[in-house]
């Protein structure tokens, strides 16, 4: 397995590895496998068809070659038959050859005599065409120039071959005769180069005729090159066979001498002599070597495109370098013209559109690579990725590219690197933004020099959360605008991580500040004069904790809105990733809100330390401790209720009710004896819980959850009174019923009650506690064996101090 698949697997399995996640990964990999198999089958079918077609063509070629050989054999047979059928054939043959030689010599003489005039005529035509704008005139003499120049070059090449078989004097004469031709060829090449540069402009100027004539020249040159290459290969093969035959006929001594020659002569085939013989026999009647004008065309197209990109690079330099991304439409316009107009003017097998596209892609890729290597800012990276997306979409929509044919102008590896670079830059910037935001909002939270803000409903809030999600939304909006799902998911993932860190920092700050406030309160109660400047704690912590709690609800709403809005813009796979990342932050917001709520409760009940310490004491039976507790809670709750989000307040009041009861029962740790005579204990209990009940009924007035909240919390007090007042022999039965409700309770409650009951001896207490503990363990074992999963109860956190001693 390559490193890329390994990295992909690592990316998939990092983080949460729940069964659901494993199933999702499996489904994703199966989908990818199906896609790959489909693509492989599609490509296999395509290439199988091409191979099948090639085999058919090969068989056809084989049959054609066989047919040609048969026809050649028939011609040879007819020639031999005629040769022996005619009297004095040799004399006639030599006379014919002599006549042909005289005729050829006469023709060469005439062409040499008129060659200078021909050169002057061609040059005049070339000068005239080079002086005019071909896009306006249409270059009317183009085909004439090419025809005349081609004839002149053919004549020159043939005469040069002949001269090499003659004297050196003849060779010098020939060189002098044709010395002017090279300059004229250069002018013609210059004309062709200019026309090649303007091929696309010909279509714009409606000079389609000129484009067709230009391509006709290149087409003729290509066909003539192919023809002479085939002839040269035939001559080469024939000469090599003759050479091999001559070596075999040499005596052994001469062959040995040839092998021992330290500097053997290198012969280049076809030889000049071989070409000369074919010229004289009439096999070669035009050029003697390929001229490569097809490559001249391709190079001209490539150079013209490179030159256009060079001009563009010169235009966009320095600070304007990245502005080039907004001025790329001309590339698509050029390619559209090539596809719709130019491609119709030249032979289909040239695939002229691919020639243009490949060079445009090469130059564009080079340009984009340079931009990427310039370490662009985040917004520029997005522009680059957006252009790449536009480039690919345009190829599919306007040029008919299939999904497999489309390729990234950046390059797949470079694109992944760009994704990472963008996300890394975003993380750096977002970390800086969040860091600055946290510093500002924590300073406000710790100093508390002004009260929190209030919205139109009177709910308290701080500015930090709104500002934080404005940053988040802005970056997500930018990422969504790129139409790159990976970018969008990456931004959501990174920002979710930052939100999680921010949540942890809030929990830490809240915990520290509550601890500081409690410490201040305790020192103040003991001796106000002992408080140092370091101990000083600004007021308003309650209001700020309410504001922080409310902010978490808003933050959760923001996160859900972002998930809903932007998840719809991507595929199901990416949508699930976005949802998972943002759902992870929802738990964090709930934790911060819970931390704030519990902090409020800690502060509230810290004010009630003294009355709770007197519960079950002698003064309690006729005292007003419960009323004092209720009045204090009422004062707090009346202030908090209109300032706290209603959903949060329900959860908050649930915790307050539970804490009221837990603190009440915790008074068992002082081991005050219950006074059950004349039902004094029972009456005091009823009195207190009537007070608490009325308090919470009033606070929850109008709330649909009122009865449920009060009932589920106050039920424990019924068990408490039964365990405290019923006969000893019924305690275990009551305990059994208690466990059915409060399955996660400790034994502490029963121990505390038994220690406070005068009618229970030490030995009886130990026996009951032992049996009750066994019942507790047995009940939990049964739950586990039966796979019962229940919600935690209020009594899960009830602990008495003497249990720690």
Swiss-Prot record:
The lineage of its organism: Eukaryota, Fungi, Dikarya, Ascomycota, Saccharomycotina. This is Exocyst complex component SEC6. GO terms for biological process: exocyst localization; exocytosis; Golgi to plasma membrane transport; negative regulation of SNARE complex assembly; protein transport; vesicle docking involved in exocytosis. GO terms for cellular component: cellular bud neck; cellular bud tip; exocyst; mating projection tip; prospore membrane. Belongs to the SEC6 family. Component of the exocyst complex involved in the docking of exocytic vesicles with fusion sites on the plasma membrane. It comes from the Eukaryota. Pfam families: Sec6 (PF06046).
